[in-house]
């Protein structure tokens, strides 16, 4: 039987839609099943509540994808309060230091994470500025890759002094 996955989205935006569409495309043709997808508003308290609902509704969840590490924190707390830590893995995103540390320590509940590079923001700002000051049209699609963080490479993404 394939893995059963619960998804926590951010807010209804283009960015969130693109992440979810890419996630769904990656699963296409696999035996993995998306149980549910709800918005948690990029917020750990909302994510906690959504995850509590998932835990009550679904007796079997193999994995949870929280589209951001702040939401993953709320998800992890809900799972811990339900005593189901050994039943599912959680994947977030953004490279929050507390999550990266747990990956470094080989926490079985947090096998991987992904970066959302600051270059995404600086590139978008630069292209927006060029659009206003240049006569050249700024068109096209730009993809800035994220990095997969694993126990083997987590140390290079761990910054203990980071505020995030």
Residues of each region from the PLM?
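A residue-level marker of the well-folded mature domains of exported/periplasmic proteins
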Residues: 1-164
């Amino acid at each position: 039987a394939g893995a059963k996955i619960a998804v926590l989205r951010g807010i209804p935006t283009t960015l969130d839609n693109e992440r979810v569409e890419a996630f769904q495309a990656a699963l296409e043709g696999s035996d993995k099943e998306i149980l549910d997808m709800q918005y948690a508003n990029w917020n750990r308290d909302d994510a906690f509540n959504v995850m509590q609902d998932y835990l009550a509704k679904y007796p079997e969840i193999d994995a949870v994808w929280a589209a951001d590490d702040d939401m993953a924190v709320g998800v992890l707390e809900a799972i811990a309060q339900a005593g189901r830590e050994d039943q599912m893995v959680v994947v977030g995103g953004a490279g929050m230091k507390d999550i990266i540390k747990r990956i470094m320590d080989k926490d079985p509940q947090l096998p991987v994470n992904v970066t959302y590079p600051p270059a995404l923001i600086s590139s978008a700002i630069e292209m927006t500025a060029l659009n206003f000051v240049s006569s050249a049209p700024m068109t096209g699609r730009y993809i800035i890759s994220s990095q997969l963080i694993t126990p083997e490479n987590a140390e290079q993404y761990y910054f203990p002094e980071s505020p995030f």
